[in-house]
Amino acid sequence: MNNTEHFGKLTERMQAFREEVLDAKPYIDAQRAVLATEAYKENQNQPRVMVRALMLQKILEGMSIYIDDKSLIAGNQATKNKNAPIFPEYTMEFVMNELDLFEKRDGDVFYITEETKEQLREIAPFWENNNLRARGEALLPEEVDVFMETGVFGMEGKLNAGDAHLAVNYQRILSDGLKGYEKRVKELRAALDFTDPESIDKNVFYKAVLTVIEAVRDFAQRYSKLAKELADKETDAKRKEELLQMSKICAKVPYEPANSFREAVQSVWFIQLILQIESNGHSLSYGRFDQYMYPYYMKDINEGKITKEDALELLTCLWIKTLTINKVRSQSHTLSSAGSPMYQNVTIGGQTTDKKDAVNELSFVVLQSVAQTRLTQPNLTVRYHANIDKHFFDECIEVMKLGFGMPALNNDEIIIPSFINWGVKEEDAYNYSAIGCVETAVPGKWGYRCTGMSYINFPRVLLLSLIHI
């Protein structure tokens, strides 16, 4: 038996769905940019945090939605799979400079229609010197410009787009739902003392959080309604039932807590998706997926509500949906980030906070699902340690033999002591996950780009040093 046969094949529809997504031509998508521009224009008097919340609300209310006919999960980033939205609040400079070059680039080719070009030309003037890149460059010393122009170091990705590199607290989202966050925020807001000047900023922040929660809830409800409409027209009995179930689930999560494996998967996907609709950050990672999803998986298995095969198909669908997320970078940025990578990392294995092996039944299912899909997304990372389940580790080796570069291995024996030496609490150190390419972080507790980032061209530094000796 070869390695491919060892892990089994995708179901027929997931194989077809996979091929559809892989074959999809990536287009530049202007819809988000147009909606974001309208939101910024309408709310110029608002504090920035409120502008961002209202922008997300407008996008989630106005963007096109659809449900793929082979998908078990609802939620799309753009008007079509693999389309790349534009985020004008970061910059429009490279977008306008490359408007007629996207289809001619050496790497990361994107297609663009004349209609899209016209839409982008119409909104571009509003963003001139009114974006993240412009403000960032205004803060930099003149010497930095020289070093950037001569290639000593670069920050193209940081100036042109979000960078994320974090894993959110999915365990809490699943157990509390956004409804739990809403309750907490309302309590904090009600307790504000407005004789304290800091309460002004806190109140604005709380208001923004409540706006976002409402927007996310309504976004999921849009899919609930769409799934019901599709179900009413569906003639295939099995698909009709799936759409009705999808409608029911989307009416509930992520606002309400998840109570089943299917609800948990849909809830996680909505949050994973919306964060990238809002911020354009890559390396938005799933965290310790087999740990926070395990209770929902085992509950459904024990109650006979789902089989391992059902869960396997659902996870392969999730990974295919993960591949639909796309991001356009400037041509110069593609020189170091070719292939439109999104670095959405999934971590399995490792240890529990009481130092026991964390491998469970779902760890094997996740591993098998990634082996079956064999995609560039998500990045799969296995946390290795001295007492890891031997059979599980052997299975990891078998996946590596498939030759698509996964899973990566993180060594708990090195990483956990290092975190503790840096002052990270032991329970957090044992709960770390991979984010992005190879970085590590504590899910839900470490924020944006906590690992730092800089591209330094050391040979260029040496060359300049020799010139000036």
Please place each PLM-identified region on the residue numbering:
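Helix-boundary capping/turn motifs
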Residues: 216-220, 288-289
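Extended non-globular scaffold/tether segments
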Residues: 207-218
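Conserved catalytic cores of very large enzyme subunits
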Residues: 2-206, 242-245, 249-467
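Heptad-repeat amphipathic alpha-helical coiled-coil interaction surface used
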Residues: 217, 224, 228-231, 240, ...
